[in-house]
């Protein structure tokens, strides 16, 4: 498990450094991808964590998804390389952005719901 954290950190660094040489669109999408690496690591840890640790991991996921969502909303569809090259229309670029934002909103909503459910489960004494 320790190696997965190291690998995730290395991938995060590569993605961030790689994003520095690309367009604004590329930097923004690279940041979203870098956060996704962190989210994958947190989701992996959820599988074997105890209840208290899960709450912390859900907080981490909520923070990651919130950051991704904030960044995704800043995407300018006109800076999409596919739009600039003419392979998609502006409407398709806008749809792509909206789909990405909607997906991130669903992930955030699910993490919040799962976290709240776990908090209620922990707070509710077991029925005897």
Model feature map: region roles:
Residues 54-128:
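Intrinsically disordered, glycine/charged-rich N-terminal periplasmic/extracytoplasmic linker segments
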């Amino acid at each position: 498990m320790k190696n997965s954290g190291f690998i995730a950190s290395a991938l995060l660094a590569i993605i961030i450094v790689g994003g520095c040489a690309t367009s604004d669109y590329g930097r923004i999408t690279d940041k979203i991808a870098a956060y996704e690496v962190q989210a994958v690591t947190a989701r992996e840890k959820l599988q074997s964590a105890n209840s208290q640790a899960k709450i912390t991991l859900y907080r981490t996921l909520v923070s990651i998804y919130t950051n991704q969502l904030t960044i995704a909303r800043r995407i300018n569809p006109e800076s999409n390389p596919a739009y600039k090259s003419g392979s998609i229309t502006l409407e398709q670029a806008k749809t792509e952005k909206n789909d990405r934002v909607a997906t991130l909103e669903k992930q955030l909503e699910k993490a919040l719901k799962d976290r709240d459910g776990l908090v209620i489960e922990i707070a509710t004494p077991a029925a005897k």
